[in-house]
């Protein structure tokens, strides 16, 4: 099966707002995580080649639920997690979806890995490192993706990658992928890495 065709059929299933509303799948899941406004929705639309699949907002913290997308009629599930960091939502709402996200990550047996997005324009921040440390503590596999690379020079990307590699990380999956949803750069490589969960 060609890489692009793997993600070509994408169907939104549900936006879970509580533990009880989390759907029960037995097929592999790959979750997208990252800071608020890191570009998760744009990336979903880029890898599925459909601008209408995920709603894009310029306001940070727009995603306040866990969105599930069925890929290729049941080949796998792509999961869009709420962004961490700044949000215009009240504290109770933020705490609610953070707890939901933590529950999902800790209890999802069919979760193959987390694709953690880092905004290349903003850089690698302490809040990103905190999330990585949390994943490490709980032994959750993750792969890093630098987004919006069309907005920065290549030497900036090198610095970010170098900073990340300075840490002793045991559950990271390499390579670190550079992508631009706008220019479609790195999208095919990312699809390939996501599709590895199907082969397991």
UniProtKB/Swiss-Prot annotation:
Residues that hold Mg(2+) according to the record: 41, 63
Alphabetized SUPFAM superfamilies for the sequence: P-loop containing nucleoside triphosphate hydrolases
A Gene Ontology BP annotation from the UniProt entry: division septum assembly
EngB-type G domain sequence ranges: 26-200
Binding site for GTP: 34-41, 61-65, 80-83, 147-150, 179-181
Cofactor(s) named in the record: Mg(2+)
PANTHER family registered for this protein in UniProt: ENGB-TYPE G DOMAIN-CONTAINING PROTEIN, MSS1/TRME-RELATED GTP-BINDING PROTEIN
Family: Belongs to the TRAFAC class TrmE-Era-EngA-EngB-Septin-like GTPase superfamily. EngB GTPase family.
Name used for this protein in its record: Probable GTP-binding protein EngB
Organism of origin: Ehrlichia ruminantium (strain Welgevonden)
């Amino acid at each position: 099966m060609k890489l692009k065709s793997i993600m070509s059929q994408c169907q939104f299933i549900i936006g879970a707002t509580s533990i009880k509303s989390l759907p029960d799948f037995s097929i592999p899941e790959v979750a997208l995580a990252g800071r608020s406004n890191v570009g998760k929705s744009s990336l979903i639309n880029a890898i599925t080649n459909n601008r209408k699949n995920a709603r894009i907002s310029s306001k940070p913290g727009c995603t306040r639920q866990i969105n599930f997308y069925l890929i290729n009629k049941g080949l796998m599930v792509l999961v869009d997690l709420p962004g961490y960091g700044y949000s215009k939502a009240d504290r109770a709402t933020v705490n609610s979806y953070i707890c939901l996200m933590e529950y999902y990550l800790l209890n999802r047996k069919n979760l193959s890995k987390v694709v953690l997005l880092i905004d290349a324009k903003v850089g690698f921040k302490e809040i990103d490192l905190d999330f990585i440390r949390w994943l490490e503590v709980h032994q959750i596999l993750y792969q890093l993706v630098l987004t919006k690379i069309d907005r920065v020079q290549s030497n900036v990307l090198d610095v970010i990658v170098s900073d990340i590699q300075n840490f002793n990380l045991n559950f990271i999956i390499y390579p670190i992928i550079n992508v631009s949803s706008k220019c479609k750069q790195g999208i095919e490589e990312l699809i390939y890495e996501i599709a590895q969960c199907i082969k397991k």
